[in-house]
Amino acid sequence: MKRGLLFLLGFFVVAGVGAYFYYGKAPPSAEGFSNETTPNLASLVKTRTSTEQPNVIILLADDLGWADVGYHGSDIKTPNIDRLAKEGMRLERFYATPICTPTRSAMMTGRDPIKLGLANAVLMAWQDGGVSLDEKFMPESFKDAGYDTAMIGKWHLGHTIEQHLPNARGFDHFYGHVNTQVDYFNHEFAKGHDFQENGKIVDNKGEYATDVHGDQSVRFLTELRDKTKPFFLYVPFLAPHSPIEAKQEDIDKYPRRIDTPVGPKKTYAAMVDSMDQAIGRILDTLDEQGIADNTIILFYSDNGGYPNFGADNTPLRGGKLETFEGGIRVAAVMRWPEVLPANTVNDAVISVIDLFPTLASAAGITAGNVKEIDGVDRWQAVLGKGDHWRGKPLIFTSNIPLYNHFQYGVLDGKWKMVQTVNHLRRETEVETLLFDVSADPNEKSDLATKHPEQVKRLTAILDDRLAEHPVGGTFVQISPHPGWRAPKDYADVVLPADKVNQAPHEGFGAVASKFLQQRYGDKGKIIYE
């Protein structure tokens, strides 16, 4: 009963349920770590002597809370993540999106998820969508530059046609699952098996998914990669996303925590612990192969944690699904021993949208998306030489269907607006909050009435973006279409590329775009009348 209840709760969380406002005292500074931004950071950056292209590894946690790592004061044992922080640079103003599919699409394309039709929700197993085939993904650029590319873990960017899968989006090797919320032990979602290697079914039931992710990453590093090339390795862990499941030996490490039907903190802690162990095996392998110094490692979470399942975003407000800081500002660390100074703190604002151009710049390659990239190259900011602010506003959006509302966030410099639009049966309510996040990062003081000019300015930024890109694309679908059944194995039901029409169709907006532009100008608002 407990496991079934947790699965049901997790299903609703994936779909965008349950705003949660979390307040608390700031966690104590972990021993050996400072919460203060490192002064004169640029002077500590090392001059690189090697001419070899660096390897790149992205380690992505799923729903990890801000305070769920040791270096932020957690009691969860994360010695390997802490090691990355000790040997690298903490990015303390790193922003993702409130939910996972938008974060992943932004990272892979360098584009605003609202332009991809993926800003508001996650892709579920019964949805056929994915990122447009017109977009060029980050691993494609690394592959074009001579890198060996691999992905181990959770995809979640389209799974029903061949061109949406990792092997068609720049990855030479893929081992993992295409859906979210796959059972950690039996590897099923909605009774359909979901683990594969390059399109072929993998039957490894009984093995804990996080262990598989770690072991397969080590396998790539030791056996599969072409050692004559640099490599790009993307490891999106499922952990600590629901279903809340862990190995008993890891659960037993946290006797002082208590599991309850809502907020299974003991099991959640064990899931984070297991992910950290997997990261440790990857780090050890890099050391054993003598390639750690020339490998860029980026660790971050795809969104904030969900407190009802045990995550802790203290002292930030809110959590997953929300555009408050607790939902979008995430734990992030970058390590590159040849270049970045150890045990440093960088508070430059960096977005997940910026990762494609930033990592490309660090590696000395071209970020080759054929579409205009919205992300900003923040590599100089990482080195302590660039501007603290990224120069362009960040817009966040989330659809929470059980509450029938959207929540938006606009961050521009020190000012941040959070706007909640409640669609009631007979009317719509709009609540607008304004924060100075440089002085009030925990968003305790609403300044909307004191600074109406900032509310007006940020609202105009949001309105212009929504007018240019009307709310559309993927919406949260918390239940499948009538009659839908999961396939026995998701790897078996992919539509081959030669069976898919190659001409994109964007819907009513594309068909009527000239008429709409004549009527509304270059914004081309979509109306139905």
Model-identified regions with their sequence ranges:
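Long, internal low-complexity/basic segments
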Residues: 4-8, 14-54, 61, 65, ...
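Active-site segment of extracytoplasmic enzymes that catalyze sulfate/phosphate-ester chemistry
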Residues: 21, 33, 37, 58, ...
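A short beta-strand-to-alpha-helix junction
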Residues: 51-52, 74-78, 95-99, 125-136, ...
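Loop/turn elements at helix/coil->beta-strand transitions in domains of secreted/extracellular proteins
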Residues: 52-57, 87-92, 144-150, 170-172, ...
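Short, solvent-exposed turn/loop segments enriched in Gly/Ser/Thr/Pro and often Arg
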Residues: 70-76, 90-111, 151-163, 177-181, ...
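Formylglycine-dependent
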Residues: 118-120, 125-128, 132-144, 157-230, ...
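Histidine-centered active-site microenvironments of extracellular/periplasmic hydrolases
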Residues: 162-170, 243-247, 284-339, 351
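C-terminal cap/loop subdomain of S1 sulfatases and analogous C-terminal strand-loop tails that border
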Residues: 164, 172-173, 178-181, 305-311, ...
